[in-house]
Amino acid sequence: MAELRLSLNDQVTPELLRQIQKLQHPGKLMKGISLELLSLTEKAFEKEGDPAKWKSLAASTIKQRNKKGHWPGKMLQVSTAGLAASVQPFSSATEAGISAGSGRSAKYAAIHQFGGQAGRGKKTTIPARPYLPMRQNGSELDLTDGARKSILEMMYDYVQK
């Protein structure tokens, strides 16, 4: 008859238990992930692109902003209470993410992330200017390669420490 014997030494067991406990209570990791997503978003606003530079504003938009004293300036940051300021991290013990826009401004946030028709009668085409670290893949949203890499590194570090 075959016999299987498993023995753990005292040095391995506490470390293994610590790692298992970390995985049972990942709230700290989730908070870190949400803050990393926020940081990546802030970098996209600063660089006005992620990874490719955003398409320039329409000449009519530049003229309108210039008239109001908002040009030159950042494309999606006309006011301090605008789109960039609306991006907020959220986390719990089981999830992490960021949100952009709320209420009426949610449509504004989405049109700039994904592009599409806007304005009265939906006659204006707004090009996608992705600022969140995610891309549309059919009906799904995927993290960008950079965001995925950062999060995987955070997860690895979390378990190793």
What are these regions (language model features)?
Residues 1-161:
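Short, Lys/Arg-rich flexible segments
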